[in-house]
Amino acid sequence: ERFSNLSRARDAMSDDGTSIYYKEVINQRSQWIWWASHVDNMTSAGGTASQTYTNSDDLPTSTSMAGGSNGAAPTNAQLINGYDYFSSAEDVDVSLILGADSNQTLAVHIINNICETRKDCIVCLSPEAGDVVNNSSYAGKEAEDTIAFRNTLPSSSYAVMDSCWKYQYDKYNDVYRYVPMNGDTAGLMVRTDTNRDPWFSPAGFNRGNVKNVIKLSVNPKKAERDLLYKAGINPVVTFPGQGTVLFGDKTLLAKPSAFDRINVRRLFIVLEKAISTASKFTLFE
């Protein structure tokens, strides 16, 4: 990052009236740095323009950052506190919630206390990493462990689950890593909204093609796909020469119903929101 033509004066402004005080510019525009304090040899920093001057001691300053820490992994309580921001349908309008790498405790909370309470959004979930990335039991047990994880979750038409994680390039850290597929599942729904409508299925070869995949943590075969789909888990499959595809469009609703399909649940969410909005203007007429 480079920021030019800045000032040490707190009231300094550019020709268009925006602040060029270096502290404000760094804190508002930098993606990596938060200003803490003036360096020792910066004369009159933080004063007004009339108080600021230059002397021979004001030399370019170079500072190296060291001793940082990535901190501790967030706890379930902290994550729940963050997700609870979406709990009120009146305050926050949201259609899709990403479960990221949620464990069973967090996934149940999102389903029961956010999506089932709001009834106007869907959460996208993935298996736990230990079940599908270098399976902690033994290779070949991925489908069984994924189904076991799904069976710890409640039945809900407001939740969707895929079958694996994907291996992709992380451009921000210049490494390859596994990431849960629920972000891609949500992305397919958004792309379907853009190209068609929410009541079209986001799965299949026409609308379910997943991008930016080096490989899948597990590529289920037909027998495994049948078991996963029966449990309400949507398999993600790489077909040679045809790409990687979301090969199912079920919700986590356990009982047979039209609402065990993603597109049906999303159709009714759209209808209910539209009816609610329209009825506001006739409520007291």
Each language-model region and where it sits:
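Extended, beta-strand-rich, solvent-exposed assembly scaffolds of outer structural proteins
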Residues: 1-15
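Outer membrane pore-forming secretion/assembly proteins and partners of Gram-negative envelopes
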Residues: 17, 28-30
